[in-house]
Amino acid sequence: AWINHINSGTAFPKANVNKHFWKSDMMTQHGENFYMSAKIISKRTYGTESLNNENIKGYNLPLGATNIMTTGKEYDNIYPVWDWTRIPGTTAIGNQDKTSLEGYQIGNNEFGGGVSDGVNGIIAYKGKYNELQANKAYFFFDNMMFCIGSDISYVQNDNVLTSVEQNLLNGEVIYNDGQEKQLSSNSNMQLKQLKWVYHNNT
């Protein structure tokens, strides 16, 4: 269904389907014209790998990375300019040196896993990587994903960043900080009372 959707725009079945891939610590949710996923790590899995000088900045990929897609093209051509400290769904250290990966990343946390009834699901983990402690949980309901973090702590001076999404600009960016507004072109903004952002169908 996903290949047909990418190639010809064929709609997904209207029913939502949730799947927990327990051998790889991953959960997917898809329905008509959307796909979402979350990837975690545990002692049962290799989170990611860097071999043949590839994926050398992929350390954060298994630490709660999410994908949110409605067209399948959301991340096309982004990787040359991708900020590897801000992988969607992750809570990570804002230092490019902390993204470096060599060989296999083996999970060290006991608590990690998920549960699915085939329609909705939850996946979560509790871990400490690069001295950053975080509890992360991802709840999938219908066409929504709720990402929850707690007990986040880090003793060094680098910023700790929780990222919701990162893709190339495609159309208007609408946000609400008490009032609904449109982000102007070529702007860089920090908001303290942000309620929501809408861009690229999400």
Label the predicted regions.
Residues 1-202:
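Extended polysaccharide-engagement surfaces of secreted carbohydrate-active enzymes
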